[in-house]
Amino acid sequence: MTASRLTHRTFFAHASLGLAAAALSLCALAPSSVRAATPLKFQLDWRFEGPAALFLQPIAKGHFSQAGLDVTLDAGSGSGGTVTRVASGTYDLGLADMAALMEFHANNPDAPNKPVAIMMVYNNTPAAVFALKTSGIKTPADFSGKKLGAPVFDAGRKAWALFAKANKIGAVSWTSMDPPLRETMLVRGDVDGITGFSFTSLLNLEARGAKAQDVVVFPYAQHGVKLYGNAIIASPKLLKENPEAVKAFLKAFAKGAKEVLAQPDAAIASVKARDGIINVELEKRRLKMAIEQVIASPDARAEGFGQVNPGRLSLMASQVSDAYATKTRVNPQAVWTPAFLPTAAELNVLPPAGK
């Protein structure tokens, strides 16, 4: 009788262990969509406008979830704020202007969690300076002695010293305002020119009654200022603790970006789904302008989507150190790493030139 009990106990013990092992094996083999997804919080640089489709598309199409990620995407209020919030740990990742990231690094050398850029999205800065033709401004040098307007944190305003040096522009005066008033003040004649993103301010000027043919636009990238624009940045804590999640994020993002660049009109549906009050046709134009001017630009095609040229990055670090008068010099190796980028084939997302 005792032997029989022992036999039964032994059988059930072995059976229980076998079931537990089988369950563990099934969990290991289960697809990422079945396992608990890794939560990631991402903040954009600005509102949900056309270019946000690059991030909303992979959410809408399930690319992030299929990669085992639960991505929360929030609008931003400027690159500087996004950099600060990733540094504080409020967000894991974000989209921010490379110059803003460099400025944060150089002004906060002892900060413990300085974000790092891990994929370039806007290969060229979207910064530009605008004027109305009625002002008589025809070349960048004509801004000498003029009154310019922009928010104090505007990327073009902060990098104005570089643009002025490259184009031999004399002293100018600045008027500060909140972003919604920038284009209004130019149309009213309160200022002679404004700085802003090329695909934002032009459309805003049109919305305020100006005609595109009556606006003079000088993109920084086409006038001697080859700064990088917005990049995906990440918390070093995330990079250290979950590098595989970072790699999965960038791979899924690249997949979505390829779809957006191939069919931008269709991709705006993802933006409309997130913000139902957008003007669809306006945001289609904005997205296409961003693609042409900063995402699939000649420089982006030469360097490859998502990547940077080390020499160009080093030059930018030096330029930002000077123009922004940072406390310490920017170390280009500290602000960028290509270690998490997808393969070359997965980064082949740019549409054929001319399309």
Regions found by a protein language model. Name each.
Residues A3-C27:
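Twin-arginine (Tat) signal peptide motif
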Residues L29-A36:
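Sec/Tat signal peptide C-region and signal peptidase I cleavage site
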Residues A36-R188, D192-F199, F218-Y220, V225-K226:
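Short, glycine-/small- and polar/acidic-enriched structural segments
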Residues D74, A117, W174, V260-S270, ...:
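Surface-exposed patches in mature extracellular/periplasmic domains of secreted proteins
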Residues A99-A100, N108, L181-V280:
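Pocket-lining segment of extracytoplasmic ligand-binding domains
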Residues E241-A325:
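Secondary-structure end/capping motifs
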